């Protein structure tokens, strides 16, 4: 099954991406590219908060973990993303490492990557209470198109 969503969190802040809606050119990209691109999105979003810190990425994708820890990749598809991560680390003075954690144990990130599912929204609620159900708050964590695409799924559980 192709990976069509991604997500990440830092503290209580989070994001969700629908590759087809938000980044159409990534819709058919390899899973390794999407997994590493999710880390890059997180770095762009939170790098200013990471100044002087050691950030540990938890991923269930071994290619992502390896590329981050080695700061390189043999994959020509991953290498530009790794380089961009490297320059963000330099620009914002943070250290980035990664550890492998099976998706079932990386609970919040796993639920965020499946945020289209009502069950995953309810599971994420336990980590992000109460604001995950505030419609206005949700709009800040995903694109306009993705928000409206998912709104029909959320309608029974979101509070206006």
Q: Which residues fall in each region the model found?
A:
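RNase H catalytic domain
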Residues: 44-108, 114
């Amino acid at each position: 099954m192709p990976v069509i969503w991604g997500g990440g969190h830092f503290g209580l802040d989070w994001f969700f991406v629908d590759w087809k809606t938000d980044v159409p050119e990534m819709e058919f990209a390899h899973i390794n590219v999407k997994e590493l691109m999710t880390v890059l999105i997180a770095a762009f979003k939170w790098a200013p908060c990471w100044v002087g810190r050691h950030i540990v990425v938890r991923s269930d994708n071994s290619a992502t973990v390896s590329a981050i820890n080695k700061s390189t990749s043999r994959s020509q598809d991953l290498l530009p993303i790794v380089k961009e991560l490297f320059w963000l680390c330099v620009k914002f003075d943070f250290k980035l490492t990664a550890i492998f954690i099976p998706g079932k144990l990386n609970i919040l990130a796993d639920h965020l990557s499946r945020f289209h599912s009502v069950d995953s929204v309810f599971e994420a609620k336990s980590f992000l209470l109460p604001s995950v159900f505030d419609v206005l708050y949700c709009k800040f964590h995903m694109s306009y198109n993705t928000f409206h695409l998912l709104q029909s799924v959320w309608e029974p559980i979101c509070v206006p």
